[in-house]
């Protein structure tokens, strides 16, 4: 799988204006900043991108803007999963037409679908496109846990399922995926605090919302691992870990946008019903960013 996607992929936040409209100018700036910091790829319209609050038309427009602004500099893997197979197929085909490298697809959610129904959904959506598919396991949101065994069945049944993003937070499951299926699919881990552990275990990379805030720092950890400099990787990760822990402690997207605001790169508010990060967590974020060399008081990014 020499040509497979790998590295640090940003789970791109969707900037909104004060009126909660998609801020295309802010989105373009975010894409440029992230790519300039060395990120390896972009995943728009995922959970961090607040896809559940976007209309299908808005999701398509965000994908168009991201692919246009990336301009071939890095791969773009839009999330195209939806509650219905019909909508997921429409979004997936649009992403392929627009120039996506691959698509990421979460399991259908809200209704408690069976494993058989979920597998059929994946087969139908993947079969509607010719580009690779990344299965997105997010059991806390979907109510369906794509265990290594279930994913193994999907991998054997869906020819273009080439990637898995595991955001279960279950490291043992991620490790099983890596060791049992890593020669067939590339495994990305999406739980921020497991970033280094997953890389050391052999993950292809990570799709991570923290890349909206500290893209360069995450790439530095990844590069150290790739170079075999584990001492440096652990040193860099030790500094980053408090910020990662603050992100996953609750209200993830609010924390990401709060941190973006603190460093002077505002993503705007969460779209309703999401709210801003509370003052206590904002202070924790502020202190974590200060320890990394940022100056949140001045809203200045000290280092990429």
Predicted regions and their residues:
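Active-site beta->alpha loop and helix N-cap motifs at the rims of alpha/beta catalytic domains
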Residues: 2-145, 153
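C-terminal alpha-helical cap/extension of soluble enzyme domains
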Residues: 2-15, 33, 37-39, 48, ...
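A general structural signal for well-ordered alpha-helical segments in protein cores
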Residues: 5, 27, 59, 63, ...
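A generic secondary-structure micro-motif detector
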Residues: 20, 52, 81, 184-185, ...
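Residue-level signature of catalytic and energy-coupling elements of molecular machines
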Residues: 20, 164, 285
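A structural signal for short hydrophobic/aromatic patches embedded in well-ordered alpha helices
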Residues: 62, 121, 154, 233-236, ...
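Catalytic alpha/beta core domains of metabolic enzymes, predominantly
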Residues: 127-128, 139-248
């Amino acid at each position: 799988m020499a040509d497979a996607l790998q590295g640090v992929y940003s789970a791109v936040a969707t900037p909104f204006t004060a009126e909660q409209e998609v801020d295309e100018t802010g989105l373009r700036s975010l894409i440029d900043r992230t790519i300039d910091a060395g990120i390896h790829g972009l995943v728009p319209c995922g959970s961090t991108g607040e896809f559940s609050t976007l209309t299908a038309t808005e999701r398509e427009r965000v994908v168009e803007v991201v692919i246009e602004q990336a301009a071939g500099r890095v791969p773009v893997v839009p999330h195209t999963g939806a509650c219905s197979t019909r909508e997921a197929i429409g979004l997936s085909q649009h992403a392929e037409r627009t120039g996506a490298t691959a698509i990421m697809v979460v399991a259908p959610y809200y209704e408690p679908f069976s494993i058989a129904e979920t597998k059929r959904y994946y087969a139908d959506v993947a079969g509607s496109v010719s580009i690779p598919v990344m299965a997105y396991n997010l059991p806390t949101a979907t109510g369906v846990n794509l265990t290594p065994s279930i994913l193994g069945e999907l991998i054997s049944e869906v020819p273009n399922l080439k990637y898995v993003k595991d955001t279960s937070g279950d490291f043992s499951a991620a490790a099983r995926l890596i060791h049992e299926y890593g020669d067939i699919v590339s495994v990305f881990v999406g739980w921020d605090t497991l970033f280094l552990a997953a890389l050391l275990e052999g993950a292809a990379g990570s799709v991570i919302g923290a890349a909206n805030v500290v893209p360069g720092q995450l790439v530095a950890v990844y590069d150290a691992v790739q170079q075999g400099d584990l001492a440096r990787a652990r040193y860099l990760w030790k500094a980053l870990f408090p910020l990662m822990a603050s992100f996953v402690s609750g209200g993830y997207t609010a924390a990401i946008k709060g941190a973006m605001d603190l460093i002077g790169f505002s993503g705007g508010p969460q779209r309703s019903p999401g709210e801003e990060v509370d003052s206590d967590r904002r202070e924790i974020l502020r202190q974590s960013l200060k320890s990394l060399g940022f100056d949140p008081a001045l809203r200045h990014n000290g280092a990429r």
